[in-house]
């Protein structure tokens, strides 16, 4: 009995050490997951964006929230987390499951979920180690309003294929800005 318990404790310690040693550095696995998410979003394209030019819309992407200069690391991570959470919510709707290939959508859910877990572990460590305040409420609110505008647009367009295509392209744009923010954070370290 003592040997299995000791082995279990050793595994717990090693597991904690590997996940707690991230030092909130947005791990390489998160970066790879981010890249895979972008590839999945690109693969999800069903129709040409050019055939949907009449449906283009300015969602007023909150670019200032992604500039990264005014952020503390924990605040930036909270903004990244919010973008991924809102993207997950957007593509988890019943209307989304009708619009997209189910196999690709399942892969997208998996990637987004893993990124959320990576960021949550990072946020928890930042609180545990530094006691840093995690959220800039204005930034989080700006991201939420951005996604509300996207949801309203989809509703107004009755979740048409072109509306979803415009939204898919917009989400790719937001993920590109998120990636740029991550890179700036890494360079600051």
UniProtKB/Swiss-Prot annotation:
**UniProt KW keywords:** Antiviral defense, Cytokine, Disulfide bond, Secreted, Signal
Entry's localization field = Secreted
Entries under Pfam families matching the protein:
Interferon
The record ties this protein, via InterPro entries, to: 4_helix_cytokine-like_core (IPR009079), Interferon_alpha/beta/delta (IPR000471)
Its signal peptide is: 1-20
Cystine residue pairs: 24-122, 52-162
Give the record's GO biological process terms: adaptive immune response; B cell activation involved in immune response; cellular response to virus; defense response to virus; humoral immune response; natural killer cell activation involved in immune response; response to exogenous dsRNA; T cell activation involved in immune response
| PROSITE patterns the record matches | INTERFERON_A_B_D
Which parts of the chain span the membrane according to its record? none
Query: What GO CC annotations are associated with the protein?
Result: extracellular region; extracellular space
What is a GO molecular function of this protein?
Answer: cytokine activity
Record flagged with keyword Secreted: yes
Its primary localisation, in coarse terms, equals secreted
- PANTHER family, per database record: INTERFERON ALPHA-6, TYPE I INTERFERON
User: What is the role of this chain?
Assistant: Produced by macrophages, IFN-alpha have antiviral activities. Interferon stimulates the production of two enzymes: a protein kinase and an oligoadenylate synthetase.
Q: Which family does it belong to?
A: Belongs to the alpha/beta interferon family.
Q: What is this protein called?
A: Interferon alpha-6
Gene name, Swiss-Prot/TrEMBL: IFNA6
């Amino acid at each position: 009995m003592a040997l299995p318990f000791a082995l279990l404790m050793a595994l717990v310690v090693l597991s904690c050490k590997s996940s707690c040693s991230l030092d909130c550095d947005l791990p390489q696995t998160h970066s790879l997951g981010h890249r895979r998410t972008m590839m999945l979003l690109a693969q999800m394209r069903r129709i040409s964006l050019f055939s949907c030019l009449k449906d283009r819309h300015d969602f007023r992407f909150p670019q200032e929230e992604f500039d990264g200069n005014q952020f503390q690391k924990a605040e930036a991570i909270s903004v990244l987390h919010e973008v991924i959470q809102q993207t997950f919510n957007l593509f988890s709707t019943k209307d989304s499951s009708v619009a997209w290939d189910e196999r690709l959508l399942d892969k997208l859910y998996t990637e987004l979920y893993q990124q959320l877990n990576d960021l949550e572990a990072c946020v928890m460590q930042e609180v545990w180690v530094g006691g840093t305040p995690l959220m800039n409420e204005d930034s989080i609110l700006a991201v939420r309003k951005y996604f509300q505008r996207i949801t309203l647009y989809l509703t107004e367009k009755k979740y048409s294929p072109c509306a979803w295509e415009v939204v898919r392209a917009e989400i790719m744009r937001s993920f590109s800005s998120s990636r740029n923010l991550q890179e700036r954070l890494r360079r600051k370290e």
